[in-house]
Regions:
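Zinc-dependent metalloendopeptidases
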Residues: 1-269
Length: 269
């Protein structure tokens, strides 16, 4: 988001193109828990006020345990850069370590050997990460191939953009999902505007990709969710024109919020 001076001398807000990460959910045919995952995906709903039947709630409660993405609390996760300049690596590493002060997980950056988190800057032009322990699935994330990518971070990228993107992707690596897909997300999308926007640059997504990454919400019992957090690092800045509720844009968050801290501490006490 940038400020632009108009002829009257008053600053107006101009939104740069929204770059958001692509959710890397393992396809059913590559997931050993595919029957559980398929059932969970079928319970994704289009609105947060969907009410599930008692038998659905019980089934989802069981799946939430089987399908957990969390690492073991106290784990030391090895991270390895597959490419990128020394400056890009240094800036990424510094931001990633910020998560450690809030939870019982450590990141160890190594230069050789195996690593749970393998980082690229050139796999494609997008930003994405495996969600939690999905990184261990070698069918979907083969050894020596990235489990995380930063397609637009470069030497000259501002520090606040590194903070925004790296904290977000390492949030995924810890098992967090997008805040705008939480069942507690209260904003109302302008579906036609969303479809038009994300089919264009810089994302070029298909309608199915847009539904999967923006419009759909998880079932209320499919994930752990309390209240919607407008300051969450897992929420991207969306232009107000993408909503039909007239409430303006979502925040441009570059640091973890108080609720992010509380949630990650609960995940990894």
């Amino acid at each position: 988001m940038i400020r632009k001076t108009v002829p009257s001398g008053i600053y107006s807000i101009v939104h740069e193109p929204v770059k958001i990460c692509f959710e890397r959910i393992i396809p059913d045919n590559m997931d050993p828990e595919r029957s559980v995952r398929r059932a969970l995906r079928e319970h994704m709903v289009a609105s947060a006020d969907h009410t599930l039947k008692a038998d659905e709630l019980a089934h989802l409660a069981r799946m939430a345990v089987v399908n957990s993405k969390k690492w073991q609390p106290g784990a030391m996760l090895k991270c390895h850069f597959l490419d990128g300049s020394p400056k890009m690596r240094k800036k990424t590493q510094a931001v990633a370590h910020q998560w450690e002060q809030y939870c019982d997980i450590k990141f160890k950056f190594v230069t050789s050997g195996t690593a749970e988190i393998r980082i690229s800057f050139y796999a494609d032009n997008g930003s994405w990460s495996a969600v939690g322990r999905d990184a261990l699935n070698q069918t979907y994330f083969p050894p020596h191939q990235p489990t995380m990518n930063y397609g637009w971070l470069r030497d000259g990228t501002p520090n606040n953009e590194y903070s925004r993107v790296v904290l977000h992707e390492f949030g995924h690596a810890l098992g967090c999902v997008h805040e705008h897909q939480s069942p507690k997300f209260t904003r109302k999308w302008n579906t036609a505007a969303v479809m038009k926007y994300f089919q264009g640059p810089p994302n070029y997504w298909s309608p199915d990709d847009i539904r999967h990454n923006v419009l759909e919400k998880y079932s209320p019992r499919g994930i752990s969710a309390t209240k919607f957090d407008p300051k969450s690092i897992m929420l991207y800045s969306f232009d107000g024109a993408l909503f039909s509720d007239g409430l303006g844009s979502t925040n441009e968050n570059t640091t973890v919020s108080k609720d992010d801290v509380r949630m990650i501490k609960a995940m990894y006490p």
